[in-house]
């Protein structure tokens, strides 16, 4: 219901604004599981109830959205999809990398959005296999659709 969705969104924003994401070992362990053992990640997600699935996907999305501010000096991305893929890939690199980017002590400084990021094919033009991590949030959203027959509610309507 709308009240529960708003509460989940408020929790995600509070989780980010009060830096609880930095110490959320469970969240980051699940992110790491998705990059090193995708089958185990899928199994774990499948065992989550609706609230846990929504909480995870929305927190992941919030972390992606916060990268926008840090990436703005790099100029416009090649496309909206490549920017979204890059943000998902960056969150999937884990807590230390994400924190360094957000804190301005590492990460995308100096990257040129017009060239592919080393180790990341922005436009998938080479046919290279997709790097682990880009689709972590999508896995949760896909499971939601399979389970409930509808798109996962969009968090930006609530924060």
Kindly label every feature range from the protein language model.
Residues 2-69:
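N-terminal domain-onset segments
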Residues 43-119:
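Core of folded catalytic or high-affinity ligand/protein-binding domains
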Residues 95-159:
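Basic, alpha-helical nucleic-acid-binding regions used in initiation and control of genome expression
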Residues 31, 75-77, 140:
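Generic preference for hydrophobic/aromatic residues in regular secondary structure cores
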Residues 13, 38, 42, 80-83, ...:
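Generic, low-specificity signal for short hydrophobic/alpha-helical stretches with a mild N-terminal bias
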């Amino acid at each position: 219901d709308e009240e529960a969705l708003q509460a989940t969104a408020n929790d995600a924003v509070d989780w980010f604004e009060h830096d609880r994401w930095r110490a959320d070992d469970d969240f980051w362990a699940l992110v790491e599981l998705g990059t090193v053992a995708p089958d185990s990640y899928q199994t774990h997600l499948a065992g989550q109830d609706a609230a846990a699935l929504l909480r995870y996907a929305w927190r992941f999305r919030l972390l992606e959205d916060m990268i926008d501010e840090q990436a703005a000096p790099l100029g416009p991305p090649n496309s909206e999809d490549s920017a979204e893929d890059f943000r998902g890939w960056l969150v999937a690199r884990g807590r230390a990398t994400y924190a360094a980017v957000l804190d301005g002590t590492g990460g995308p400084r100096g990257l040129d959005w017009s060239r592919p990021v080393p180790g990341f094919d922005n436009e998938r033009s080479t046919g290279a296999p997709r790097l682990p991590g880009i689709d972590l949030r999508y896995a949760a959203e896909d499971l939601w659709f399979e389970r409930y027959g509808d798109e996962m509610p969009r968090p930006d309507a609530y924060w």
